[in-house]
Amino acid sequence: GVYVVVDASDGQVSLANNNSYLGTTQIASGTLMVSDNSQLGDTHYNRQVIFTDNQQESVMEITSDVDTRSDAAGHGRDIEMRADGEVAVDAGVDTQWGALMADSSGQHQDEGSTLTKTGAGTLELTASGTTQSAVRVEEGTLKGDVADILPYASSLWVGDGATFVTGA
């Protein structure tokens, strides 16, 4: 299928609103700035965002309230770990996503990877995930809408002043 690869080295990239590609959004390097769910492909399918390259720093920065849940898809966009990745949520921003998922390529690249949550805003996961990645909450809040959002994570670290909250 068609997908988008962000390979910005140490730069930043923003995608236009109302993108209709049906595949995934893959972050190999650099920072993908996200301010609207429609920037990440067709919202009827709500394909995942994937961190793909352990050799380079990969960041997804959420700059405004983005709710990736879609009535048509029946779920929020998942974040898939094939490499280390950082989700930075700007101050005052509350963003809703699906689950933190394992590597779907069969290569088990989520094992040994780390998701780092930075920024003063709130990253809300609305489903239980499958990743075996380590999870670091360095700033802001990581919130779960279900009781066990990270059942297989290799570790969970919450820094001073950061918050981890589970729901239901």
Predicted regions and their residues:
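Beta-strand repeat architectures
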Residues: G1-S14, L22-T95, A102-E124, Q132-A168
